[in-house]
Amino acid sequence: MHCFPCFSSPKNKKSSTTNETNDNNEPKPDDRRRAEETEEIEQSEGTSLKIFTFRELATATKNFRQECLLGEGGFGRVYKGTLKSTGQVVAVKQLDKHGLHGNKEFQAEVLSLGQLDHPNLVKLIGYCADGDQRLLVYDYISGGSLQDHLHEPKADSDPMDWTTRMQIAYAAAQGLDYLHDKANPPVIYRDLKASNILLDDDFSPKLSDFGLHKLGPGTGDKMMALSSRVMGTYGYSAPEYTRGGNLTLKSDVYSFGVVLLELITGRRALDTTRPNDEQNLVSWAQPIFRDPKRYPDMADPVLENKFSERGLNQAVAIASMCVQEEASARPLISDVMVALSFLSMPTEDGIPTTVPILSFKDKSMSIALSRHDSNLVSPPPELATEDDKSSTSSGEESSLESEKESVSKNEYKKKHEEEDSSMESDDESDSNSEHEKDQPPKPIDEKNQAQSLKIKYRYSWEDIDVNDERLSSKSSQKSNDESTSSRYDSDRDQDEKGKEEEEEEEAEEKHTHIEHIDSSKTDDDQSVYFDNDDDSGDDNGGSLHRIKSDVAIDSIKE
């Protein structure tokens, strides 16, 4: 009687234990799945990402019907769907099953993507990791892709004008710059192309289909992806990536340059309907890059030349830098973004209303743009310092010249007291030399824009300073000479008044002078020297003047 309760109690305890575990002492699949979902929810609490079941997304896309297919990329297919719970229209990307990440690895990457938030990136709103299914849910962009508007426009739609194209390029560069410089860790796009740039109703671009790859060690443009699988699109992929799978941030810059060329030319990156030498857009454009006169021929014919020639030259220069063969020769996307900010500005008659001073991290971009337009490059700060120094030095030199002139005036006066005829000849020679020196310098020809930049920022600043110094010194010397000559005239008048007194004294001392002259005939040159008593060695004074003795004797006899 008492045995039944005793045996029944242990039996019930054992049965409850078998319900929790299987024969191998492991949790049942339902419990394991419930635990994983709980862990996913806990990890997703820090983000705004939603977790969807496969059934929800299958219902939203009508079981992934062909009519809902939006496109197919390197990572899978994209379907248009409507969430039954909220009525929101979304884009569901069903990733390929080969090479699938584990659930935790996939979740970690998706959570990292969920933290990326920029106006020019398509927003990730949720994901699904149900069994072997891996799906991403994005906001739906209704305007279509850049490829549709450029290469497959609707019959009733107008072609994009030049300003709109440059604004799209600038905004796309902003999104790519966010992935390269702002995201942590940096994200390599890997497959940037016109079909992955989506446009909303306002033609604002949003980059899509980026980022499902871990990034390896490294910094800056040396950041490399771990995956060795080449996922890019031929025509957009950088040469180093196509040849050896070497993927860096500069690989994205190359792809962006191809997209920019598409916006400029209206051609596809790869068009098999064209002649063999024109099928690849970059190969066709490379020879034209070397001849700026052919740049207008690159413009999309549908633009009907309604663009600024200067803007076209700048855009082509930027694109040529981006598609360089060597990755190290390409600019940073941040520099590309800064350069495009100028081209995307509102214009009046093809000229921007305001001209910014551009600042680049890499000098190569500044050099490339300066070859086409001097308005984008400001004079180096060193030139301003040199100008200040030259003005100061010119002031010092002018003061020195004035001092020299004051000294020369005294000497000038002494010379004119002794010899009138020699000074008259000197005045004539000085006036002739001054007339030759006062000829103005030839003006600098800045009609050629490409040449004016070189003249303005390398040579003309120094030449103008030197010419200004010479002109200022010449003018000061001329004014000093005029004042000296006026003073000499007054002194000569005084000398004439005292001439009569000197003649009387000379008459009294006539005999003494004759004796002095006779004694001087013993010299070799038979001459008398008058010394100015100045040992300074200056060219303007201190020289010895000679008067022939026979002339002096004749004057005395008279």
UniProtKB/Swiss-Prot annotation:
The modification Phosphothreonine is found at T53, T233. Pfam families: Pkinase (PF00069). Interacts with PRK6. The modification Phosphotyrosine is found at Y138, Y241. Residues 419-431 have a biased composition (Acidic residues). The active site is at D191 (proton acceptor). The gene is LIP2. It is a lipid-anchor. Residues 1-45, 372-558 are annotated as: Disordered. The modification Phosphoserine is found at S195, S227. Residues 64-343 form the Protein kinase domain. Belongs to the protein kinase superfamily. Ser/Thr protein kinase family. Palmitoylated. It comes from the Eukaryota. It comes from Arabidopsis thaliana (Mouse-ear cress). Residues 15-24, 473-486 have a biased composition (Low complexity). It is found in: Cell membrane. Changing C3S: Loss of membrane localization. Involved in pollen tube guidance into micropyle. Participates in perception of the ovule-secreted peptide signal LURE1. This is Receptor-like kinase LIP2.
